[in-house]
Amino acid sequence: MKGAFVTGSTGFVGLNLVEELLRQGWQVTALHRVESDLAELGRFPVTLMPGDITDAASLRAAMPEDVDAVFHVAGNTNLWSRRNARQTRENVEGTRNVVETALARAARKLALTSSIAAYGEQSGELTEATKSNAGKSWINYQRTKWLAEEEVRKGIRAGLPATILNPGAIIGRYDTSGWARLFHLVAQDRLPGALPGEVSAVHVGEVAKAHIAAAEAGALCGTAAHHRPRSGDPRGDHRQAAATHPGIGRALDA
């Protein structure tokens, strides 16, 4: 049985990944903060390990030796500048700790949950060949996601097989804020307005499966980008998404 170590296991993407790993027969060790709500994660047959990615000692104590795959899902998506210091600590220093611990524990593969935000501000279609400008971005989230990728690339150069995944806007089960909140407002006809624009959306089930596929791809190192552009009237797009969001209507196909 393959073994997985998952950070961010109590979050939206982490819970879906844990569920998919178990469905595919993996043995899961789930890192969680001491203060985290374990109501959802506690339902799954996983090994719960308290710790924090910003605490290297707790990571070393939690991560199994020679684990088949480390899934670094934990991340700070804050867009409030007053919390930039914490975001930098968690996204950059936390990723550095995960990479260094994975190397020390001889992990066979690492998969990083990054974001298309790590490409910065771009025009046109994004591909894996697109050059990021996020390192100079005034948006701390963009910059720290790119810097987190840099930590993984350092790990690759040090001999750690790793893959970076760049999903767009993730929607699906276990989301209790973000897009889910927007969809509920639309479903209740309480959305006051919507600006024109587009969003690249991907279902969380596909994101979870992509992580596992990346971990099973042997020594392959690279970036997998998910982007599904939507266009047209923004309120219409939001209504379509709301009608198919789990908990509101028919679940989106995974």
Enumerate the predicted regions with their spans:
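Active-site Tyr-X1-5-Lys
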Residues: 138-163
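NAD(P)H-binding glycine-rich loop region in Rossmannoid oxidoreductase-like domains
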Residues: 40-93, 101
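Mid/C-terminal beta-alpha module of Rossmann-like enzyme folds, strongest
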Residues: 210-254
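NAD(P)-dependent short-chain dehydrogenase/reductase
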Residues: 158-164, 168-200
